[in-house]
């Protein structure tokens, strides 16, 4: 019996090689691995000894030889295969142990392109794929976590076909991930801004979550290794383990507050929707105003800031039940205060990269550019132009409605949401919902503004706004009844802006 071992990461490999040797396997290895195993007192044959051909091109070609791959791909249930390996003096290889050059790690070190290319493994993936293809006979190991249990089963002679299939699945997943990292790295390094006919998206599991969206669903967190920052890279400073829903809401929250790079803002998120968003002269004021916008929904919410949280703000945060607090930083007093709530998840967030958006549908995936453009052109389409104060509120509300589930309407005044209508199947219902929310918490709508993420198909919404004293509207435009809606605004003295850009969110 023969095993070939060629690994970059050496952890546990000496123990595995020794166990294989004790089971009667002859160990064949490549340069660095062979040297390491010999230092551990294990007898090893170099690949060049069995092929009769030396490593060439500074190690670029080591195992790409018929003696190696014939030994792996040999089918012991095919008579012609038996005749051929006997004819060519090829000995079967029964176990293949490989891990690959660390391209992913080297990518982050800022190497020159030519130096980085040296860490694209060629021989390793070829060995892995050959062994995995022939899993009926060959054992393939790519993960050190599998070494111990496989050895135990080999000792007992009860390694099943299902075990072999599992190891082959891991092997093909491993090479697919490796190639996915390389593929996406090329897009990033050479600014290849296109969606390919075929896409390989590398995903690496970070953790098993308690459950998915609901307790009966399994849930896992995977990261994209090509994105250096993002919610998966955030630092959890304290509290319970983040849940599936926490991650969804936290991601929505940080995307919203990122819309305000030059203003202090707080956003409170529930079920992937904002329930209160506000600007403030301080983080404390921003939080209090955001909470005031909907104090009922804020209970158990996710709170995000785009500025450092101080002790005074932390005291306000700990006065109510919250799931998660997210901010770019916290002062020492804030961390002391927040630590009083042992279960409260406190996260330090470093930002995110705009890449592309992926959504699962039955039988496939939808890929799209992320929605990063705020508007195409701001065009006043009514007789009256917005005042400076209205304009500030319109832009504030427009940024919020961009992150609200369709159909979405946001009512705002003085840099604070007064009412948010989200996820309704008609736009007028979203408006009514937002108005009812505002009235529920005692807000005066006179002088407030409205943002709608898509066009108003009829004038009915404008007539309702006028009755409430709302004075300005921002929307994309684009309806066949735009003129009817503009006329309604002019009748009521409402200023309206078209943005030329829609922000559906599903």
UniProtKB/Swiss-Prot annotation:
GO molecular function, a single term: IMP cyclohydrolase activity
EC number: 2.1.2.3, 3.5.4.10
A Gene Ontology biological process term: 'de novo' IMP biosynthetic process
A GO CC term attached to the entry: cytosol
Pathway annotation from the record: Purine metabolism; IMP biosynthesis via de novo pathway; 5-formamido-1-(5-phospho-D-ribosyl)imidazole-4-carboxamide from 5-amino-1-(5-phospho-D-ribosyl)imidazole-4-carboxamide (10-formyl THF route): step 1/1; Purine metabolism; IMP biosynthesis via de novo pathway; IMP from 5-formamido-1-(5-phospho-D-ribosyl)imidazole-4-carboxamide: step 1/1
InterPro entries: AICAR_Tfase_dup_dom_sf (IPR024051), Cytidine_deaminase-like (IPR016193), MGS-like_dom (IPR011607), MGS-like_dom_sf (IPR036914), PurH-like (IPR002695)
UniProt cross-references to Pfam families, sorted A to Z: AICARFT_IMPCHas, MGS
Top-level taxonomic group: Bacteria
The reaction(s) this protein catalyses: (6R)-10-formyltetrahydrofolate + 5-amino-1-(5-phospho-beta-D-ribosyl)imidazole-4-carboxamide = 5-formamido-1-(5-phospho-D-ribosyl)imidazole-4-carboxamide + (6S)-5,6,7,8-tetrahydrofolate; IMP + H2O = 5-formamido-1-(5-phospho-D-ribosyl)imidazole-4-carboxamide
Alphabetic keyword roster: Hydrolase, Multifunctional enzyme, Purine biosynthesis, Transferase
Record-annotated MGS-like domain positions: 1-142
NCBIfam families registered for this protein in UniProt: PRK00881.1 (NF002049), purH (TIGR00355)
Family: Belongs to the PurH family.
UniProt remark on domains: The IMP cyclohydrolase activity resides in the N-terminal region.
Name of the protein in question: Bifunctional purine biosynthesis protein PurH
Organism of this sequence: Aquifex aeolicus (strain VF5)
UniProt lineage: Bacteria, Pseudomonadati, Aquificota, Aquificia, Aquificales
